[in-house]
């Protein structure tokens, strides 16, 4: 073989080696992109799966906070009637509960009674309603209101 032919073969061999290296690099890049898409898909599925449980937990916490705030508003209204020595009312009107100076919004997951009013006499005793019932997705929360002394008791009834 002559020198020019050897040089050409060497040049072709070097070119083929470089092309193989580029093909391998391209395959690695494609594999890395495929891995990235796979990981992104798995993370998306996990995020969507967890968002439902987070949402239900948030709703449960929101319900608990609402009932604690309702009980506090009940006691505040009772204290106001004693302090002012006047009859005071706590009005339940669907999505809003109010005592004239304070308002409490009922969350979307809870159905509150509408058109009911709890009236406290000058001594702070309840002189109107015997019970108030709220409906939730898990059942009912009923407040037993003791006439005369103004005490309140929460009773939870779950759906079967």
Curated annotation (Swiss-Prot):
<comment type="function">
    <text>Required for formation of the type IV-like pilus (T4P) that plays a role in transformation. Transformation pili are dynamically extended and retracted, perhaps thereby promoting DNA uptake and transformation. Involved in transformation. Required for DNA binding.</text>
</comment>
<keyword id="KW-0178">Competence</keyword>
<keyword id="KW-0281">Fimbrium</keyword>
<dbReference type="GO" id="GO:0005886">
    <property type="term" value="C:plasma membrane"/>
</dbReference>
<keyword id="KW-0812">Transmembrane</keyword>
<keyword id="KW-1133">Transmembrane helix</keyword>
<dbReference type="GO" id="GO:0009986">
    <property type="term" value="C:cell surface"/>
</dbReference>
<feature type="transmembrane region" description="Helical">
    <location>
        <begin position="30"/>
        <end position="50"/>
    </location>
</feature>
<dbReference type="GO" id="GO:0009289">
    <property type="term" value="C:pilus"/>
</dbReference>
<dbReference type="GO" id="GO:0030420">
    <property type="term" value="P:establishment of competence for transformation"/>
</dbReference>
<keyword id="KW-1003">Cell membrane</keyword>
<protein>
    <recommendedName>
        <fullName>Competence protein ComGD</fullName>
    </recommendedName>
</protein>
<comment type="subunit">
    <text>The transformation pili are flexible filaments, consisting mainly of the major pilin ComGC and smaller amounts of the minor pilins, including at least ComGD, ComGF and ComGG, and perhaps ComGE. Interacts with ComGE. Interacts with ComGF. Interacts with ComGG.</text>
</comment>
<keyword id="KW-0472">Membrane</keyword>
């Amino acid at each position: 073989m002559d020198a020019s032919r050897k040089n050409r073969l060497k040049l072709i061999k070097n070119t083929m080696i470089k092309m193989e290296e580029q093909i391998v690099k391209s395959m690695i890049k494609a594999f890395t992109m495929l891995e990235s898409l796979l990981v992104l898909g798995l993370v998306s599925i996990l995020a969507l799966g967890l968002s439902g449980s987070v949402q239900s937990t948030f709703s449960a916490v929101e319900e608990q906070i609402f009932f604690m705030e309702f009980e506090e508003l009940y006691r505040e209204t009772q204290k106001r009637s004693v302090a002012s020595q006047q009859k005071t009312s706590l009005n339940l009107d669907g999505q809003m509960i109010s005592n004239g100076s304070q308002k409490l919004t009922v969350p979307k997951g809870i159905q509150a009674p509408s058109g009911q009013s709890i009236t406290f006499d000058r001594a702070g005793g309840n002189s109107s309603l015997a019970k108030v019932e709220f409906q939730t997705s898990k059942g009912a929360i009923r407040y037993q209101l003791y006439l005369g002394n103004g005490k309140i008791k929460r009773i939870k009834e779950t759906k079967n």
